[in-house]
Amino acid sequence: MSDLDQIIRITLTRASQPVATASFQIPLILASFTNFEERTRVYTDMQGVAADFDSTDGVYKIATKLFGQSGVGAVPPSIVVGRKDALESWVEALDAVNEDNSTWYVLVADTKDAADQEALSDAISANRKIYGLSTADAVAPTTGTTDIGAILSAKSAGRTFGVYLPTAAEDYPEAAWIGAQLSYTPGSNDWDFKRVNGVTVSKLSATAKNNLREKNYNFYTEVGGVNIFQDGNMFDGLPIDEQIVIDWLYARLQESIYFRLINSLKIPMTNPGLAIIENEIRTVLSQAEANGAIDRGWSVSTPDVLSIDPNLRAQRTAGVFVFRARLAGSIRRVNLEGYLSV
């Protein structure tokens, strides 16, 4: 202890209380097994998975796809494996798993049954999470309407995406795609045109591709000598990455404002107080722009405190704050005109 420390002793305490932040990089494998008693376990590599599951188990096969994409994409920092009991429905199992561990963002379920997939899609639609499935149903590339894609497309299932692949039962293409793309920062990547490891290429006619697109399926084919996924959309026809960006914005705005509320003695119902909330909104939008999620030129409108309804002021409810931003999106098609002369 220095001489000055003997005279003046100072204790510094970090006053800011952190809040839990939602992760958008962690997939969940939901499967029926008896390998462990707890409802969920977290794994950070295949070595851990291999210690609990045989190579013939569905969980092992799915995890291999999730962790096996380092050469063509990113790798999840961890995965959650959730257990389904034999007497549970898939939705009951999902609810129980989510109660035990809700840190995951995208679901991969070890079932190819269309009724199970529809039920899981309906359940996911009520949460800020997404679900990736695959099917080898021969009806999918036709004009038939009994396959899972036709069913979910009719529902505009905007939190579920699906892959048609004749070898879906063995290849788990949705898991490979998730493993390659989920770990990128939301807003920085488009899921279209992406390569993966360990997935058999489909050979599809132009008619089959058209039928699949009519139902908002994705598929894995060879284009220009490269094997790629197309089209990177949910069953409502909107891009997968767009839904992820929307969920990211919702979570980060909520977390940022909550952080400021719990780490302030109070935020006064005054114009300077409203400016504190505005600053939190601007911080998140600035990060969204840096991530490539939104274009520059966004704006935030903050109300004057006297324009807020007196009843809301009495309830200590501030607003309405309004921000406007354009999603940056991505380029998927290019039109070009060239004029040559001699």
Tell what function each PLM region has:
Residues 1-342:
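Surface-exposed assembly/interface segments
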